[in-house]
C-alpha cells in the first residue's frame, strides 16, 4: 500500500461550462491531462474519476487509470468520486484535485502532503477565507464516513468535514499562492484564465 495517492475528479456534468471541462484546452493539452501531469511530479499513484460519457476520450489524454463512480453511487457528486478512487487505489492519504483548477502547482501537493498527520482525518486549505475541500487531503479512514453519508443520501463536502477531525491550513501560512486554487466554472472564467496565462 502506498502512503500517498492522487484522485482527480472529472465526473461532473459541467452544466455551467456547456461542455466537459476535463477536455477543455489548456497549455496545448487538456485540463485533465495537465492536472495529471502536475500531480505526477509529486504522486506516483493517480486515478481519474470520469463521467461515463467522456471516459474513452479522457483515456486518450492520460497515462493513468480512468474509472467511473462505483455503480451504486454513480452521480452522487464529489463524495462518490472520492470514495471510488479510494477503493481503486489503496493508500494512507489521498490528495484530491478537481479537473477545473488548472493553475494548480506541483508545489501545492508537496505542501499539502507535508501537512498530513495521522492524528487528523483531513487537511483542508483555507484560501482567502474560504475552505477548499476539493483541493485537500483525506486519510483512508474517511472512506467509511463517506459510505455512511452516501447511505443517508447526504452528498455535501461540508457534511463530510463536519464528521472529520480536520486540520485547516491557511494558504498564507504555508506560502500557497491563491491563484493555484482558482476554479473555472464558466466560459467567461475560462477566457479570463487563458488571458492570465498568456500574460504570465
Swiss-Prot record:
Signal peptide: none
EC numbers, comma separated: 2.7.7.77
Cofactor(s) essential for the protein: Mg(2+)
Keywords: Cytoplasm, GTP-binding, Magnesium, Metal-binding, Molybdenum cofactor biosynthesis, Nucleotide-binding, Transferase
Pfam (any one): NTP_transf_3
A Gene Ontology molecular function term of the record: molybdenum cofactor guanylyltransferase activity
UniProt catalytic activity: Mo-molybdopterin + GTP + H(+) = Mo-molybdopterin guanine dinucleotide + diphosphate
Localization per Swiss-Prot or TrEMBL: Cytoplasm
InterPro entries, per database record: MobA-like_NTP_Trfase, Molybde_CF_guanTrfase, Nucleotide-diphossugar_trans
GO cellular component, one term: cytoplasm
Similarity field: Belongs to the MobA family.
Comment block on domains: The N-terminal domain determines nucleotide recognition and specific binding, while the C-terminal domain determines the specific binding to the target protein.
Protein name from the UniProt record: Probable molybdenum cofactor guanylyltransferase
Source organism: Bacillus cereus (strain ATCC 14579 / DSM 31 / CCUG 7414 / JCM 2152 / NBRC 15305 / NCIMB 9373 / NCTC 2599 / NRRL B-3711)
Amino acid at each position: 500500500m502506498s502512503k500517498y495517492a492522487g484522485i482527480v475528479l472529472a465526473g461532473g456534468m459541467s452544466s455551467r461550462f456547456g461542455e466537459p471541462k476535463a477536455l477543455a484546452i489548456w497549455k496545448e493539452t487538456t485540463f485533465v491531462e495537465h492536472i495529471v501531469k502536475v500531480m505526477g511530479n509529486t504522486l506516483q499513484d493517480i486515478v481519474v474519476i470520469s463521467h461515463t460519457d467522456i471516459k474513452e476520450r479522457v483515456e486518450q489524454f492520460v497515462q493513468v487509470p480512468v474509472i467511473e463512480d462505483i455503480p451504486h453511487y454513480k452521480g452522487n457528486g464529489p463524495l462518490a468520486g472520492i470514495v471510488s478512487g479510494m477503493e481503486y487505489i489503496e493508500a494512507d492519504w489521498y490528495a484530491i484535485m478537481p479537473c477545473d483548477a488548472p493553475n494548480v502547482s506541483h508545489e501545492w501537493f508537496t505542501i499539502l502532503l507535508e501537512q498530513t498527520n495521522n492524528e487528523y482525518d483531513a487537511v483542508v486549505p483555507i484560501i482567502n477565507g474560504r475552505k477548499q475541500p476539493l483541493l485537500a487531503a483525506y486519510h483512508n479512514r474517511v472512506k467509511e464516513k463517506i459510505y455512511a453519508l452516501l447511505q443517508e443520501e447526504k452528498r455535501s463536502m461540508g457534511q463530510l468535514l463536519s464528521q472529520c477531525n480536520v486540520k485547516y491550513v491557511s494558504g498564507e501560512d504555508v506560502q500557497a499562492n491563491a491563484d493555484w486554487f482558482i476554479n473555472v466554472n464558466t466560459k467567461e472564467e475560462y477566457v479570463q484564465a487563458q488571458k492570465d496565462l498568456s500574460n504570465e
